[in-house]
Amino acid sequence: MNIYFCGSIRGGRQDVVIYQTIVKKLQQYGNVLTEHVSYDSLSDKGEDKDGDKAIHDRDVQWLTMSDVIVAEVTQPSLGVGYELGRAVAMNKRILCLFRPFSGKVLSAMIRGASAKPLFQVQDYKEDEVENILEEYFETLTKN
């Protein structure tokens, strides 16, 4: 299974430790095409060696190849929002993870999209994320 993980890069790297936990867990279920999002070495300046167009085209190709999208959406990010919009247009299965106790409010464009059958938003606390992913992928493999 190809898994596309979305997390903030240029929007801020405050949640990189959570991204690492999520990606490590996701690797139990398949190939995480975007594991680099969880790297400590990736700054909020992002990747720059190949340029923005190359990054965009590569990431859209990975989205196309993906069986499921998992996004940590607590840290607002234009890029993550764009990726989610493209994934919805491709009819991909999407799980968005949000920490309401962060003091942030999730965009209505994300929370409101969860009325679609393939789009799910799950509120969580950090110590719950691995169990949430286990439950999601158990259900996914049964269907």
UniProtKB/Swiss-Prot annotation:
Enzyme class: hydrolase
GO cellular component, one term: cytoplasm
InterPro entries per UniProt: 2'-dNMP_N-hydrolase, DNPH1, Nucleoside_deoxyribTrfase
Localization annotation: Cytoplasm; Nucleus
Coiled coil (residue ranges): none
Domain of life: Eukaryota
MF terms in GO: 5-hydroxymethyl-dUMP N-hydrolase activity
Catalytic activity, reaction form: 5-hydroxymethyl-dUMP + H2O = 5-hydroxymethyluracil + 2-deoxy-D-ribose 5-phosphate
Biological process annotations from GO: deoxyribonucleoside monophosphate catabolic process; nucleoside salvage; nucleotide metabolic process; positive regulation of cell growth
Subunit structure as annotated in this protein's UniProt entry: Monomer and homodimer.
PANTHER family given in the database record: 2'-DEOXYNUCLEOSIDE 5'-PHOSPHATE N-HYDROLASE 1 (PTHR15364:SF0)
Free-text function comment from the UniProt entry: Part of a nucleotide salvage pathway that eliminates epigenetically modified 5-hydroxymethyl-dCMP (hmdCMP) in a two-step process entailing deamination to cytotoxic 5-hydroxymethyl-dUMP (hmdUMP), followed by its hydrolysis into 5-hydroxymethyluracil (hmU) and 2-deoxy-D-ribose 5-phosphate (deoxyribosephosphate).
Protein family (similarity comment): Belongs to the 2'-deoxynucleoside 5'-phosphate N-hydrolase 1 family.
Protein's name according to its UniProt entry: 5-hydroxymethyl-dUMP N-hydrolase
Organism whose genome encodes this protein: Danio rerio
Gene name, Swiss-Prot/TrEMBL: dnph1
